[in-house]
């Protein structure tokens, strides 16, 4: 399973641990991923997604999963999130 947020596309970054003596050793910065079920008001059901904690705060800030997906750019969303977004647009059009 990839270490990537399904809503923001946040993934693993690499860098250095730097000691007081300026010795450098390679390290990885992992995203804070959470397995959560987010509810869609328009579709009337929940969706299991693997998202970063920052993305959860963003979803709360804008007012829910539906609003977040409609505002999000398609390049950042996973295939699963894109399918939810398409279903959401169909439900709103009907």
Swiss-Prot record:
<dbReference type="GO" id="GO:0003735">
    <property type="term" value="F:structural constituent of ribosome"/>
</dbReference>
<protein>
    <recommendedName>
        <fullName>Large ribosomal subunit protein bL28</fullName>
    </recommendedName>
</protein>
<dbReference type="GO" id="GO:0022625">
    <property type="term" value="C:cytosolic large ribosomal subunit"/>
</dbReference>
<comment type="similarity">
    <text>Belongs to the bacterial ribosomal protein bL28 family.</text>
</comment>
<keyword id="KW-0689">Ribosomal protein</keyword>
<keyword id="KW-0687">Ribonucleoprotein</keyword>
<dbReference type="InterPro" id="IPR034704">
    <property type="entry name" value="Ribosomal_bL28/bL31-like_sf"/>
</dbReference>
<dbReference type="InterPro" id="IPR001383">
    <property type="entry name" value="Ribosomal_bL28_bact-type"/>
</dbReference>
<dbReference type="InterPro" id="IPR037147">
    <property type="entry name" value="Ribosomal_bL28_sf"/>
</dbReference>
<dbReference type="InterPro" id="IPR026569">
    <property type="entry name" value="Ribosomal_bL28"/>
</dbReference>
<dbReference type="Pfam" id="PF00830">
    <property type="entry name" value="Ribosomal_L28"/>
</dbReference>
<dbReference type="GO" id="GO:0006412">
    <property type="term" value="P:translation"/>
</dbReference>
């Amino acid at each position: 399973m990839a270490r990537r947020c399904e809503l923001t596309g946040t993934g693993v970054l690499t860098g250095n641990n730097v000691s007081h003596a300026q010795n450098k050793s390679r390290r990885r910065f992992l995203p804070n991923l959470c397995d959560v079920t987010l509810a869609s008001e328009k579709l009337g059901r929940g969706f299991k997604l693997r998202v970063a904690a920052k993305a959860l705060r963003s979803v709360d800030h804008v007012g829910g999963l539906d609003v977040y997906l409609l505002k999000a750019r398609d390049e950042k969303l996973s295939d699963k999130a894109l399918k939810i977004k398409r279903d959401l647009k169909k439900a709103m059009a009907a």
